[in-house]
A protein has these predicted regions:
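Auxiliary Fe-S-binding modules of radical SAM enzymes
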Residues: 1-90, 150, 248-257, 262-345
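Alpha-helix N-cap/helix-start and coil->helix boundary motif
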Residues: 10, 112, 200-202, 225, ...
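Short linear Ser/Thr-Pro motifs
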Residues: 72-73, 106-107, 196, 219
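Generic beta-strand structural signal
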Residues: 78, 90, 101-105, 113, ...
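P-loop NTP-binding catalytic core
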Residues: 86-95, 99-100
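Canonical Radical SAM [4Fe-4S] cluster-binding loop centered on the CxxxCxxC motif
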Residues: 96-142
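Conserved AdoMet/S-adenosylmethionine-binding subsite of the radical SAM
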Residues: 143-322
Length: 345
């Protein structure tokens, strides 16, 4: 089986070009063709016949296949079900804002974290995604926009908040970020990429050393150990105080912050005491809080709190001077909102 072209970073591709004595411009031409122009066929642009033949013979240029597309009638969110070569499936979401998009990428088939508020966790972990399967979600979504919503094919933000724990698949996610950031590739700004984690410390140990500048988001969801243990079982192995200690060591750029995600669940973690404890925990940090009213999915016993309760929770956090946003549900009518992805359904 041929290796995938889309598993190569620009540095990897330069090494291949040099090892096979190809024209030094071949790496730039190929990246420009496949990532800036996002062409499907092997590069035909300014590439010598010998180089073209080499790459055709040496690499696989296929991408994950779009199996199904679900479009929200409420807010134009788009959810893709991708079929991989081994018949596993993953989901990816395009979230619209002002004719531009954020893309929510998956990093694994299923997830090992088993978070109780997340539909993906019910699948268990099947396997990690390759870099090409991660990058392929972006390229295929962009192509779909170009074909189906011409003039709107601007994906400005990349968030690793789909299926899987990104830091549990660190190497593939890291290389995907390198491709997205490359000036020869998609050239996404470093502040436009966010990687979310449940608090997987082995990945956090590598984070600041190997992915400087890329934004980090922590799925926090409760400042109380007992509640967080129920929501995020990995908290028993990697307690929140240890996770925060690692995060506090991450050097941040000017005006950069850590995002803390907080799913609000009715009569569970939505009280004033929860808010006060959360505020005290994060006060004085370079923190930004996303409050996410729970999005229901089949089989869950959790419920979403009333909007008044959500706003009261935010008001408590405001007293701690922590920037806080109540995130509206997008795509929940097609199970595309936060916590609703499940490629078995």
């Amino acid at each position: 089986m041929k290796p995938s072209f889309y598993d190569l970073s620009y540095a990897d591709l330069e090494r291949v070009v040099n090892q096979h004595n190809l024209n030094h411009s071949a790496a730039t031409v190929l990246f420009n063709w496949h990532y800036k122009k996002k062409e499907m066929a092997v590069c035909q642009d300014k590439l010598a016949k010998s180089a073209l033949a080499f790459f055709k013979d040496s690499f696989d240029f296929s991408l994950p296949e779009i199996d199904t597309v679900h479009e929200s009638t409420k807010d134009r969110t788009v959810k893709f079900l991708f079929k991989l070569k081994d018949s596993h499936k993953i989901e990816t979401v395009l979230i619209p804002f002002n004719n531009k998009y954020s893309i929510c990428l998956s990093s694994q088939v299923g997830c090992a974290m088993n978070c109780s508020f997340c539909f993906t966790g019910k699948q268990g972990l099947k396997r990690n995604l390759t870099t090409s399967e991660i990058v392929g979600q972006f390229i295929q979504a962009w192509r779909w926009l170009a074909a189906n919503r011409p003039g709107e094919e601007r994906i400005l933000n990349i968030v690793f908040m789909g299926q899987g724990e990104p830091l549990h698949n660190f190497d593939a996610v890291k290389k995907a970020c390198e491709i997205f950031l490359s000036k020869h590739g998609t050239s996404v700004g470093v502040q436009k990429i966010t990687v979310s984690t449940a608090g997987y410390i082995p990945g956090l140990e590598r984070w600041s050393l190997e992915t400087p500048g890329v934004n980090l988001a922590l799925s926090l969801h409760s400042p109380f150990a007992e509640k967080r243990n129920e929501l995020i079982p990995i908290n028993k192995k990697y307690p929140l105080d240890e996770v925060l200690a690692y995060i506090d060591k991450i050097p941040l750029q000017k005006k950069q912050f850590i995002t803390y995600e907080y799913i609000l669940i009715k009569d569970f973690n939505d009280t004033a005491d929860d808010a006060k404890k959360l505020g005290a925990l994060l006060a004085g940090k370079s923190a930004y809080i996303n409050l996410i009213p729970f999005n229901s999915f089949p089989g869950s016993h959790y419920q979403c709190p009333d909007l008044d309760k959500v706003e009261q929770f935010k008001e408590v956090l405001d007293t701690f001077k922590i920037p806080t946003l109540i995130r509206g549900a997008k795509g929940d009518d097609v199970l595309a909102a936060c916590g609703q992805l499940n490629s078995k359904n």
